[in-house]
Amino acid sequence: MCGMRILGLDPGVAILGYGVLDFFDSAPPVVCDYGIVQTSAKTAFEARLAAIYEDINSLFSAHKPDLVAIEKLFFYKMGNTISVAQARGVVLLCAAQHGVPYVEFSPPQVKLALTGDGRADKRAIQEAVQRELGLITMPKPDDAADALAIALTGWFHHLPPAAREAVPAYSVG
């Protein structure tokens, strides 16, 4: 039996990354599943949101997470930010319907937690995810790797402060 199962999510409308990790008291995290939910730009927006809902709802049903860790919105293009916010709303609706609490982290918070540098590049994050999860290769695509990084950050922030020092990636900096 696992101590905690975290569903990490990197929200998006075209591509939404997900990663499911199990955490035990003193053992390394275990990767249960990761991947992406993809929708086509040729599909009506409301149908894309419905597809995201169905796929994410299936993930909740299949994996029964104890916690959702999701990336906070990062403002860069107004139109894109609004559509990502709507996709996040769909994800948070699923979490609420399944009675699963959520935590959210900005991209710099995830980078800082995994590398000790809030401005780390994507490659450094992927290497940290690969190292912390004991993966032979870097997880692909990038959105799935980001979701695994968000799940790891969720676990780190769930730990009591004294326990954080024992986690190698998080004692950096």
Curated annotation (Swiss-Prot):
Record's subcellular location: Cytoplasm
Binding site for Mg(2+) 1: 10, 143
Leading EC class: hydrolase
Residues involved in Mg(2+) 2 binding: 71
Catalysis: reaction(s): Endonucleolytic cleavage at a junction such as a reciprocal single-stranded crossover between two homologous DNA duplexes (Holliday junction)
One GO term (biological process): DNA repair
Record keywords, A-Z: Cytoplasm, DNA damage, DNA recombination, DNA repair, DNA-binding, Endonuclease, Hydrolase, Magnesium, Metal-binding, Nuclease
Keyword rRNA processing: no
Subunit record text: Homodimer which binds Holliday junction (HJ) DNA. The HJ becomes 2-fold symmetrical on binding to RuvC with unstacked arms; it has a different conformation from HJ DNA in complex with RuvA. In the full resolvosome a probable DNA-RuvA(4)-RuvB(12)-RuvC(2) complex forms which resolves the HJ.
Example of a GO MF term: DNA binding
Name of the featured protein: Crossover junction endodeoxyribonuclease RuvC
Cofactor(s) required for function per UniProt: Mg(2+)
PROSITE patterns: RUVC
Family the UniProt entry places it in: Belongs to the RuvC family.
Domain of life where this protein originates: Bacteria
Enzyme Commission numbers on file: 3.1.21.10
Alphabetized InterPro entries for the sequence: RNaseH-like_sf (IPR012337), RNaseH_sf (IPR036397), X-over_junc_endoDNase_Mg_BS (IPR020563), X-over_junc_endoDNase_RuvC (IPR002176)
Job description of the protein: The RuvA-RuvB-RuvC complex processes Holliday junction (HJ) DNA during genetic recombination and DNA repair. Endonuclease that resolves HJ intermediates. Cleaves cruciform DNA by making single-stranded nicks across the HJ at symmetrical positions within the homologous arms, yielding a 5'-phosphate and a 3'-hydroxyl group; requires a central core of homology in the junction. The consensus cleavage sequence is 5'-(A/T)TT(C/G)-3'. Cleavage occurs on the 3'-side of the TT dinucleotide at the point of strand exchange.
Cofactor detail note: Binds 2 Mg(2+) ion per subunit.
Protein's UniProt keywords contain Iron: no
Short name of one Pfam family: RuvC
Source organism of this protein record: Gloeobacter violaceus (strain ATCC 29082 / PCC 7421)
